[in-house]
């Protein structure tokens, strides 16, 4: 399940005043949008930098979302572009994975990947960008809860970042931590759910 509450006011100072967050990051999925619609959506939220978290940043059906093409077009729109393959999805679950709460193999594999040194370095690059500019993490999937952005958002939230999922030109959705997430220092794991002795399951 995911929270469906929306935040209409996306004014940055107001959001920062709402709490003691380490910073704010947005997320967005390019989906099947035209390039013009995508740039308009970034502009509506005043996004100044885009961090591409696709592992394979190409699209045959939507070639304007290929990495090289995007980098040039975003520069023309005064938006900085950074591809971070270390944050990309399509990861395999590891033997002895501590993340058995995920029944989706792709999400379990990504949860395993999030404890790797490569992921940690990539996330710090994204955070560094977000400290300087109004930054969004981008993947292809429109719905954040069907994308590995949801796991990145969990970890950012655990580390005191505020995460806002862009849904449209006038609305974002504040991220809420997955109920299965458990802190291990600065990291998170999603251990298998415990079934009670007298449970009907």
Segments from the language model and where they lie:
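Residues lining hydrophobic/aromatic ligand-binding pockets adjacent to catalytic sites
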Residues: 1-201
């Amino acid at each position: 399940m995911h929270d469906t509450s929306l935040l209409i006011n996306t004014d940055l100072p107001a959001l920062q005043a709402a709490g003691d967050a380490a910073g704010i990051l947005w997320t967005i999925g390019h989906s099947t949008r035209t390039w013009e619609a995508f740039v308009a959506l970034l502009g509506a939220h005043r996004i100044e930098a885009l961090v591409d978290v696709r592992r394979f940043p190409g699209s045959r059906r939507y070639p304007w979302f290929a990495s090289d093409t995007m980098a040039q077009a975003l520069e023309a729109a005064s938006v900085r572009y950074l591809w971070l393959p270390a944050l990309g999805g399509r990861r395999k679950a590891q033997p002895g994975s501590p993340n058995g709460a995920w029944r989706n193999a792709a999400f379990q594999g990504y949860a395993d990947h999030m404890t790797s040194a490569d992921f940690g370095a990539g996330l710090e690059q994204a955070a560094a960008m977000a400290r300087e500019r109004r930054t969004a993490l981008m993947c292809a999937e429109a719905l954040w809860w069907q994308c590995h952005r949801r796991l990145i958002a969990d970890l950012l939230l655990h580390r005191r970042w505020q995460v806002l999922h862009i849904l449209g030109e006038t609305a974002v959705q504040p991220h809420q931590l997955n109920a299965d997430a458990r802190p291990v220092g600065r990291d998170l794991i999603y251990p298998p759910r415990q079934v009670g002795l007298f449970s009907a399951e």
